[in-house]
Regions:
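Active-site donor/metal-binding and catalytic loop motifs
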Residues: 269-286, 316-322, 455, 521, ...
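Short, acidic, metal-binding catalytic loop of nucleotide-sugar glycosyltransferases
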Residues: 92-101, 352-362
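Glycine-rich, basic loop-to-helix element that forms the pyrophosphate-binding segment
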Residues: 136-152, 396-414
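A short, conserved alpha-helix in the catalytic core of glycosyltransferases
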Residues: 235, 245-271, 300, 433-438, ...
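C-terminal, non-catalytic tails of nucleotide-sugar-dependent glycosyltransferases
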Residues: 2, 6, 10-68, 289-331, ...
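Short beta-strand-to-loop acidic/aromatic patch adjacent to the donor-nucleotide binding site
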Residues: 154-165, 416-429
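Nucleotide-sugar donor-binding/catalytic module of glycosyltransferases
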Residues: 35-288, 302
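Conserved donor NDP-sugar-binding/catalytic core segment of glycosyltransferases
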Residues: 169-205, 426-473
Length: 625
């Protein structure tokens, strides 16, 4: 099918579903935003406004790297038979920086037929002393990068390819970000920015890669950091630079070895690097460089060995992605908690799928009976206990529905090392679902919580992680996208770090549950899972999501929201406000695993209508572990 036609059909389907769920006015509002972005917001949309760049130049006028007040950053760039057009555009992007704190270190391994590379560089050197150059023998990308590093005199290093373009404010922004980290008392050893892909001109970028803050599980699935990465030269020297045996994935290897030393990284949500897409570049996919995949798996296996963890590294669901199948430590028992009121057809489907499909054997199931009124329900419980060996049914003593209270009550009967909160209207799809949830938690350095991929019966995504701030409070990642897709930057097809996952299927270490006090019963219906995950995150633990645990969620796409019932609407509004009161509105609206340049109105990871942070050159940075 023609790609444009396919995309048009997908958008039409999304518009129809959005109209059903949230009404015509909402659909029209979002549609208008989409048209604005596509038709009127393309040119130079990721660059700061001209007046911002002029202000930066004015601030730095007459200053040198020594007295500009910014840390010096030496950019390492191996050259190899670089086309003149690409080389001049790259060199121009360096000399036209708004701040003088950069040094460009060029190691030229071009062959004799490309002597023009040296001539062009020397032409620039006569005008700009901040460019240093050495002709070298070609020993591969890592060794050539190491040769460039030998020329560096800066406190920090950065990596740049010879055919790409630096944003004009790259050195200024990274220098200011380092100073900001120091002022905040945070580690300043390793930073990275966002990037954009382009073909002909950075005035017309193709797409931006708006990245999350440091996400360790994501980094083990793909090198999402890429460009522009800046790190202390002392760290580079300590770890020995890049490893030639990792050519093809040498930067990924470097970043993993850096975070082994720093314990984390800082993210600057500004587009500071433009990655050229052309035949032979990795920005066009690893099909252009097949050796990358083999190198990446070696890099990941080496990282596991250095950090004392065990698992198998495999190809991921898509090219350029990978999967660590962690070895599960011991034989942890999982207590599955399922609240239920009547709805025995749903419950039977859920229980039958657990007992007939689950490959992990060490589990118990506790159904928490919550005020059922149909006598047939209790007959069903009696029959189910006979049919499903070890099934427990416990009676919640309170009246009304309080999801938090029901699960807190059920925990009293659980004997597992892990608790699994599970809705009664889900059905297991793959045999290893529980094993895969455990893989993310039951190993040294694992997450405390892991969520699953939940699909609607029509094979669209219901849940692929929770993003706080969407719609003002919280929303689901990639909701309504067709199953089997990669999502934004592979984020629907790789293990992810999130601030929260849905309580419809949530695995948590029992010790962590007890440490934070279980679910907050003031959140009776809404946001109890979000609040719980945020308290776990704030206690220093990670929350992961895996696409390798899949369940069908029979929650209706078109079910009425709480806002349609006045009583429920008041309760929902109160729980919304409590979420702000407990965690702070600013924290809810700024999810570290969701870039501020992405939309807050939709659940599709599309670009925001509001890119003022980019246009103003706003510098915000926070280190995360």
């Amino acid at each position: 099918m023609n790609v444009r036609l396919k995309r048009a059909r997908e958008l039409a389907g999304y518009a129809v579903q959005l109209t059903k769920d949230e009404g015509l006015p909402t659909m029209l509002k979002r549609g208008a935003g989409f048209v604005r972005r596509r038709c009127f917001g393309k040119r130079a949309r990721y660059l700061p406004a001209k007046k911002v760049l002029e202000a930066q130049r004015a601030e730095m006028a007459g200053k040198t790297a020594a007295d500009c007040g910014l840390p010096t950053i030496s950019i390492l760039t191996p050259l190899y038979n670089t086309p003149e057009k690409y080389l001049r555009e790259f060199l121009d992007s360096f000399v036209n920086q708004t701040a003088p704190n950069g040094q460009l270190c060029l190691a030229d391994a071009s062959d004799a037929e490309h002597a023009d590379v040296k001539r062009i560089v020397e032409e620039y050197q006569t005008k700009y002393q901040r460019i240093v150059y050495r002709k070298i023998e070609n020993k591969g990308i890592a060794a050539n990068t190491n040769a460039a590093a030998e020329l560096a005199t800066g406190e920090y290093l950065a990596l740049a390819d010879h055919d790409d373009i630096l944003a004009p404010h790259a050195m200024y922004t990274m220098g200011k970000a380092i100073l900001q980290l120091r002022a905040q008392g945070e580690p300043d050893g390793f930073l990275y920015s966002d990037e954009a892909l382009f073909s002909k001109s950075i005035q017309r970028p193709m797409v931006a890669h708006f990245k999350p803050d440091y996400a360790p599980d994501y980094l083990l699935c793909c090198n999402y950091i890429c460009h522009l990465a800046v790190f202390q030269k002392a760290l580079w020297d300590e770890i020995g630079g890049e490893r030639p045996e990792c050519d093809g994935s040498q930067d990924h290897d470097l970043f993993l070895r850096l975070v082994e030393k720093t314990g984390g990284a800082a993210h600057v949500p500004q587009v500071l690097y433009y990655w050229r897409v052309h035949a032979g570049s990795t920005s066009g996919g690893t099909d252009a460089k097949p050796y990358v995949a083999a190198a990446a798996k070696k890099v990941l296996a080496d990282h596991l060995a250095r950090t004392g963890r065990t698992g198998t590294v495999e190809d991921g669901l898509f090219p350029s992605t990978y999967r660590v199948k962690w070895d599960i430590v011991g034989d942890p028992k999982v207590s599955i908690l399922i609240p239920n009121k009547d709805h025995t057809d749903d419950l039977e489907k859920c229980l039958h799928s657990i007992w007939t499909k689950t490959s992990w054997e060490n589990f118990e199931v506790i159904v928490i009976e919550n005020n059922s009124t149909d006598p047939a329900t209790f007959t069903y419980y009696k029959e189910a206990r006979q049919r499903y060996d070890g099934l427990q049914v416990v009676n919640y003593p309170q009246k009304g529905f309080n999801f938090s209270g029901i699960n807190n009550f059920g925990r009293q009967y659980a004997s597992g090392d892990y608790l699994l909160l599970l809705n009664n209207d889900v059905e297991v799809r793959n045999a290893d679902w529980l094993t895969e949830l455990l893989r993310q938690c039951a190993h040294p350095g694992g997450a405390a919580i892991c969520g699953a991929e939940l699909l609607y019966p029509d094979e669209t995504l219901q849940h692929a992680g929770v993003v706080t701030g969407l719609g003002g409070y919280a929303g689901h990642s990639h909701k309504y996208r067709k199953a089997g897709g990669s999502g934004y930057m592979f984020r629907a097809a790789t293990v992810q770090d999130f601030s929260a996952v849905t309580g419809a299927c949530l695995l948590v270490k029992t010790s962590v549950w007890d440490e934070v006090g279980g679910l907050d019963e003031a959140f009776a219906v809404a946001f109890n899972d979000v609040d719980f995950c945020l308290r776990v995150r704030d206690a220093g633990y990670r929350i992961a999501w895996t696409p390798y645990a899949q369940l069908t969620h029979y929650e209706s796409k078109s079910r009425g929201g709480d806002e349609k019932d006045p009583v429920k609407a008041r309760r929902f509004a109160a729980e919304q406000q409590r979420l702000y009161a407990v965690h702070g509105k600013a924290n809810i609206l700024h999810d570290p695993y969701y870039n501020p340049n992405l939309t807050m109105d939709r659940e599709d990871f599309s670009e925001s209508n509001d890119l003022r942070g980019l246009k103003e050159g706003r510098i915000t940075v926070q280190w995360r572990k």
